[in-house]
Regions:
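Terminal intrinsically disordered/low-complexity segments used for targeting and assembly
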Residues: 3-8, 14-75, 236-281, 454-461
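Periplasmic alpha-helical coiled-coil/stalk elements that build and connect Gram-negative outer-membrane
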Residues: 21, 144, 153, 160-275, ...
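Membrane-embedded segments
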Residues: 76, 81-93
Length: 461
């Protein structure tokens, strides 16, 4: 036992002089540039203490039918369920790492029979051993500590990655839902246009039959009318495609998706994006990058710890009747041993592992910086898209009003023989185009607002 204490004392002295760094803790990245979102006036005006990212997805998306779809997706989506499984695996790894401080205990009983020739006959002799072996690696040089901290970082990383998958899932369902609403609106416009243009076509045919119009006018009018018919077919096909895409996200078979209509949907006039410091705590992909850097940090610590000696305590507690092993058969055996293993030459593997670990840590640091930059860029882009859609919205509304009046007036002039069919066709097609564009712009505004919500870190709660 005296030798054991000498070994431990020498190791502690080695640690005191050289091993301080291997116990260092990772310091999370907590600062970012105040200009991460950009410096334009619109960006600065949108910054406030509050942010739409603090809203839960249920508070942000208030449509009950959309909420129902998102709930179903969160419960059933296979990618999200796989992310949950990864979290459970990391939890198991962390639990095992925490138990690494404890000694390992093995029990390996054995029994046998030997036969001896005694006075002309074989005499069997039964032997047995009941050894209980204990091995304990002392964690003087933070091998287990760094493994535990690394496992904790991996767990946090997988939890944040689950949040990334969830936020992207919420975004995908919401955007596909808005696309369905857009297509429904476009189909509504086309069906209404179909009925109006059919009346115009019948009017033109009547004029032709009475000799007041040329067949060319009828053919041109019918061509425009049939073009609307083909657009109706295309939109209905796109509706089915979007419904199928939502079904895949929900992990269900293709079926009809219930949704509400846009009605009098209005784009928000003001959006709060919060301050840049909130981005680090809100965005799960930034947290993934931070914990990946933390994992690399503890890998480097472990690579450093591999240069230090390994101290093991071994014990044996046994009971047996093997006279060849135990001087006093049937007695108790107790044995203790301490060992120190100091790596001297490992074919350059230890130095190579340390260098690789340092380079990996540097690479993770670069990826973290790029992740933050990408996040700020996404916020800037989404905010710009929101503002463009809001600005164009008033123009499209006015354009539809003007063209509606132009279409009505031109049609009346044609009925009175004061306008040609070309003027009517131009007015009809311009009005249809403006109505379709107005609906598409509303969708672009909704899509941009959803993208901004996700870019700021929303959707995971």
């Amino acid at each position: 036992m005296k030798r054991v204490f000498i070994i431990i004392a020498v190791s502690v002295m080695c640690f005191a002089f050289t091993g301080c760094k291997i116990y260092n803790k990772y310091k999370s990245q907590s600062q970012t540039s105040p200009e991460i979102y950009g410096t334009s006036e619109d960006v600065m005006a949108a910054q406030a203490d509050s942010s739409i990212a603090t809203l839960s997805w249920r508070e942000f998306f208030t449509d009950p039918l959309l909420q129902k779809l998102i709930d179903s997706a969160i419960a059933r989506n296979t990618d999200l369920n796989s992310a949950r499984i990864a979290v459970e695996q990391s939890q198991a790894s962390l639990k095992a790492a925490k138990l690494g401080y404890l000694p390992s205990v093995t029990f390996a009983p054995s029994a046998g029979v030997n036969s001896f020739l005694n006075e002309g006959s074989l005499q069997p002799t039964w032997t047995y051993n009941l050894p209980l072996q204990i091995n304990w690696d002392l964690d003087l040089f933070a091998v287990n500590t760094n493994q535990k901290r690394k496992a904790q970082a991996v767990l946090w990383q997988t939890e944040a990655r689950e949040q990334v998958v969830k936020a992207n899932l919420v975004s995908s369902v919401a955007q596909q839902y808005c696309m369905l609403q857009l297509l429904d609106r476009q189909l509504e416009i086309l069906l209404f246009t179909d009925s109006l243009w059919n009346l115009s076509l019948e009017t033109q045919r009547s004029l032709w039959e009475n000799g007041k119009a040329y067949s060319t006018a009828v053919n041109q009018m019918e061509n425009s009318y049939l073009n609307v018919k083909t657009q109706i077919v295309d939109v209905r096909r796109r509706i089915r495609g979007v419904e199928n895409a939502i079904c895949k996200l929900l992990a269900i078979t293709p079926q009809h998706i219930d949704r509400s209509s846009w009605n009098s949907y209005e784009l928000p006039q003001r959006i709060s994006i919060g301050v840049p410091a909130q981005l680090l705590s809100n965005r799960p992909d930034i947290q993934v990058a931070d914990h990946a850097l933390e994992e690399a940090f503890y890998n480097t610590q472990a690579a450093r710890a591999a240069f230090y000696p390994k101290i093991s305590l071994q014990g044996l507690l046994g009971w047996g009747n093997n006279s060849g092993m135990i001087p006093n058969p049937g007695a108790l055996l107790l044995n203790a041993l301490a060992s120190l293993t100091q790596p001297i030459f490992a074919q350059g593997k230890l130095r190579a592992n340390l260098k690789i670990s340092k380079l990996t840590q540097e690479d993770m640091a670069q990826k973290y910086v790029q992740t933050v930059i990408n996040a700020g860029n996404q916020v800037n882009e989404a905010l710009a898209d929101c503002q463009v859609a809001r600005e164009k919205d008033s123009y499209y509304k006015r354009q539809v009003e003007v063209l509606q009046d132009a279409y009505t007036g031109t049609h009346e002039l044609m009925d009175n023989g004061k306008a040609s069919y070309l003027e009517v066709l131009t007015a009809q097609e311009s009005l249809l185009s403006a109505q379709i564009n107005e609906a598409a712009n509303l969708y672009e505004g909704s899509r941009a607002l959803i993208a901004l919500y996700i870019a700021l870190g929303g959707g995971a709660k």
